[in-house]
């Protein structure tokens, strides 16, 4: 599971999150 993939799916998810939030959750 790639971090960038995780961030991508986080960003396009139902809940809008910032890149920073997604990066924090995915690392």
UniProtKB/Swiss-Prot annotation:
Expressed by the venom duct. It comes from the Eukaryota. GO terms for cellular component: extracellular region. Disulfide bonds join 6-26, 10-22. One of its GO terms (molecular function) is toxin activity. The keyword Transmembrane does not apply. Keywords: Disulfide bond, Secreted, Toxin. It is found in: Secreted. Belongs to the conotoxin R superfamily. The cysteine framework is XIV (C-C-C-C). This is Conotoxin flf14a.
């Amino acid at each position: 599971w790639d971090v960038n993939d995780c961030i991508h799916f986080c960003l396009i998810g139902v809940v809008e999150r910032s890149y920073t939030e997604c990066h924090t959750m995915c690392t």
